[in-house]
């Protein structure tokens, strides 16, 4: 559960990274594919080479979903309801992959904004990406 302090930290962090979120999402996705190669199985039709337009494009979608969740932090489930349906009913992505991608996103944020990730903000962002992953897998059966 995100505390009031966590919510404030997440909103402030996304306020600082918001304009670069798309680039960060692409880098996080690429990092996930390199670090956890088993995650590539969900993207057999993608060009998975470094700097691929498909990775950047999907990474931007991931980042936009995170921004949307941050903008609606009091109702993440409502904000991501359609995306949750998509992942549960059509894509059927293994839930562990959301944790892996969330971790990679935090690593990329830390690399680009090292002073932003104080221990408190890091903990809040970690709880936030876990909350997003929980929402995205809530409709799995």
Swiss-Prot record:
GO molecular function, one term: heme binding
Domain (Globin): residue spans on this chain: 1-141
Keywords: Heme, Iron, Metal-binding, Oxygen transport, Transport
Highest taxon listed in the record's lineage: Eukaryota
PROSITE patterns: GLOBIN
One Pfam family, short name: Globin
InterPro entries: Globin, Globin-like_sf, Globin/Proto, Hemoglobin_a-typ, Hemoglobin_oxygen_transport, Hemoglobin_pi
SUPFAM superfamilies: Globin-like
Record bears the keyword Membrane: no
Binding site for O2: 58
Signal sequence range: none
This protein's GO CC annotations: blood microparticle; haptoglobin-hemoglobin complex; hemoglobin complex
Biological process, per Gene Ontology: hydrogen peroxide catabolic process
Residues the entry annotates as binding heme b: 87
Tissue expression summary: Red blood cells.
Protein's UniProt keywords contain Heme: yes
Role played: Involved in oxygen transport from the lung to the various peripheral tissues.
Family affiliation: Belongs to the globin family.
Subunit structure: Heterotetramer of two alpha chains and two beta chains.
Listed PANTHER family: HEMOGLOBIN FAMILY MEMBER, HEMOGLOBIN SUBUNIT ALPHA
Protein name, UniProt field: Hemoglobin subunit alpha-A
Source organism per UniProt: Streptopelia orientalis (Eastern turtle dove)
